[in-house]
Amino acid sequence: MDDLGVIGKMAGVAIHDGWKPYRHYDVDHALCNAHHLRELIAVGVGWDQGWANDLADLLREAKRSVEAARTAGLDHLDAATLHSIRVRYGQLVAKGFAANPEPDVGKRSGYEKKAFSLLKRLDQHRADVLRFTTNFAVPFDNNQAERDIRMVKLQQKISGSWRTLAGARHFCAIRSYVSTMRKHDVDVLAGLRLLFEGQVWLPAGA
């Protein structure tokens, strides 16, 4: 990660799945809630734990609240809504710990380890889990990042590989440029037309 020189230079919010090496970087963090929903559903449905189902519902409700506020032209949740989300979140995590006390070392089943590890992450990094509720620039999940690399994997699946490293770099540059335009609500065809006319569109500050 250091060699790529991306995370160390960023000044925004790093949205990730909680992988510990990311914590070594001095940036604000947000955790991907698509991952949390999958894990909570696995615990709630697979092991019949109501707190997990309720917490998954709360995260979805918080997402809807943010979307409604954004649609209304707001850039924040009202204090009462935000307080309610935080209080209920804490109560559900506490219920989770009550149902899943820390297992004894050497006597942990696969389920116990997964459930307790999930609860620890949700508890210790609750501000990062809920960052999308306090900063509307932060998405609910990092699925967009995964979608950005999907075409690379699709190209590999169809063609096997690129014939040259230069070709791979050109492919990634084009996909990155198109993705950046979409994120800034720039019409892709119009942007590409400008590019071929020598009028390169770049995001503000680039």
Predicted regions and their residues:
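Catalytic center-proximal scaffold of phosphoryl-transfer enzymes
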Residues: 1-206
